[in-house]
Regions:
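N-terminal targeting/leader regions
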Residues: 1-15, 190, 195-243
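TRNA-binding/sensing appendages of the translation machinery
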Residues: 1-88, 93, 149, 153, ...
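Positively charged, Gly/Ser-enriched RNA/tRNA-binding surfaces
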Residues: 21-36, 47-48, 79-82, 90-104, ...
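Short low-complexity, flexible loop/linker segments enriched in glycine and/or proline
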Residues: 55-59, 182-184, 288-290, 392-394
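Acidic, His- and aromatic-enriched active-site or binding-groove loops in soluble protein domains
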Residues: 60-76, 184-208
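Short, conserved phosphate-binding/catalytic loop or strand-edge motifs used
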Residues: 129-135, 170-178
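A short acidic (Asp/Glu
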Residues: 177-182, 333-335
Length: 407
């Protein structure tokens, strides 16, 4: 049997040049969020299948990489009873389990930062992979809009360090639900309706209508709901909603959303707008939601929102929670397309030596430079020395020392 040299479909290898950019972005993320008081945590990539299939992950639950119970035959893999775990499809559900398990050892409220791989068994295409890195910040235990404001401020501070244009769109899941109830949908149908509405940007009003009709909903109700999104979009939830949905909305929902938008617009160097069509596909969102749009990438490059009911599914204690996820892979993709170069912070030196030369003195000198916080590479001279040095210069090795006959 011949071995296969290419990665599994939907997975990738990364060359040193791209890894340099990826590490640069991760370091920027860590340093920025640490300055806002977020604590780095880590959770396993494998989660209990019961957690992954708890109707919290929206469409992603259809994309779980399931893991068979040890020893079971591969041909029986489709039998769900034979799976007891799976690969995580995001970082939010694992964080909720983590907090429920460790709350007694954490500060309150707890500001979390987690960076790691997630897995979705979807059809690979440009910008979509089966394994990709997510970067999340979350605040657990903060019930006020201080959480949303802090998350948005920290994220805009991060994005402003990169050469990209972006807009942060903001809405509230409860406004979307109130509009659905006003149009005539039942409470128990709202999640199904919003899953279809979330595709409005991709398939348009006609596509959403066809999908909702296929789910068995009344055409008049569907059209009434869709017509609500044709109203003039004013950058104010209060002006947009008026008193139309008051019978279906909790107190202070619109007022709090107004305060989030006004505060962040005045404290962040970013374009922040109210967008009544913003949904976010995850059914676990319970309040304000936000998403980062960039004209340089089709689709969002990050998003998040409030999910106050998730942690209580693990422990019978109500715990408010809110998070923001940066689209790490998409951010890196934008930088690569711009031919972004990581700023050099250390001098790079290389010693090119003849073969069969004594190494002790040369390696000692290299270590002296490394102790001075310089990057030093020691290598033998190639037959094509000119080409060798050209490659080294491209890699940033500007200090090239050549040794001939131990000189």
């Amino acid at each position: 049997m011949n071995l296969i040299k290419t990665p599994v479909k939907g997975m990738r290898d990364f060359l040193p040049e791209e890894m340099q950019i990826r590490e640069y972005v991760i370091n920027k993320i860590k340093n920025t969020y640490i300055n806002f008081g977020y604590n780095i945590i880590e959770t396993p990539i494998v989660e209990h299948i019961e957690n992954l299939s708890s109707n919290q992950g929206g469409e992603n639950e259809k994309l779980i990489f399931k893991i068979l119970k040890r020893g079971e035959k591969l041909k029986e893999a489709e039998d769900i009873d034979l799976t007891d775990s799976g690969l995580r499809y995001d970082l939010t559900l694992p964080l909720s389990r983590f907090y429920a398990n460790n709350a007694n050892n954490l500060s309150y409220p707890f500001k979390s930062m987690q960076i790691g791989p997630v897995f979705r068994a979807e059809r690979p295409q440009k910008g979509r992979y089966r394994q990709f890195t997510q970067c999340d910040i979350d605040i657990l235990g903060e019930n006020s809009i201080m959480a949303e404001i802090d998350l948005i401020t920290a994220t805009s501070t991060l994005l402003n360090q990169f050469p990209i244009n972006y807009t942060i769109r903001i809405n509230d899941r409860r406004i979307l639900s109130s509009m659905a109830l006003y149009a005539g949908f039942k409470e128990e149908d709202i999640d199904k309706v919003l899953i279809s509405l979330d595709k409005l940007d991709k398939i348009g009003e006609t596509g959403v209508k066809i999908e909702l009709l296929a789910k068995g909903f009344d055409e008049e109700t569907i059209q009434t709901y869709l017509n609500l999104f044709k109203r003039e979009v004013i950058n104010s939830p209060q002006d947009y909603c008026g008193n139309l949905f008051n019978d279906y909305l909790e107190d202070n929902v619109i007022e709090n959303l107004e305060n989030i938008i006004i505060t962040t617009k005045n404290t962040c160097n970013a374009n922040i707008i109210f967008d009544p069509t913003l949904v976010r596909g995850m059914s676990y969102y319970t309040g304000p939601i936000f998403e980062i749009a960039s004209p340089e990438f089709q689709g969002s490059i990050g998003g998040g929102g409030r999910y106050d009911k998730m942690i209580s599914k693990f422990i019978n204690i109500s715990t408010p929670a809110c998070g923001f996820s940066i689209g790490f892979e998409r951010l890196v993709s934008i930088l690569l397309e711009k031919n972004f170069k990581v700023p050099e912070t250390k001098e790079k030196c290389v010693f090119i030596i003849e073969k069969n030369m004594p190494l002790i003195d040369i390696l000692k000198e290299a270590n002296i430079l490394r102790n001075q916080n310089k990057i030093v590479k020691v290598m033998y001279r190639n037959k094509n020395a000119k080409h060798q040095k050209e490659i080294l210069l491209e890699e940033g090795y500007t200090n090239i020392k050549e040794f001939f006959n131990n000189k």
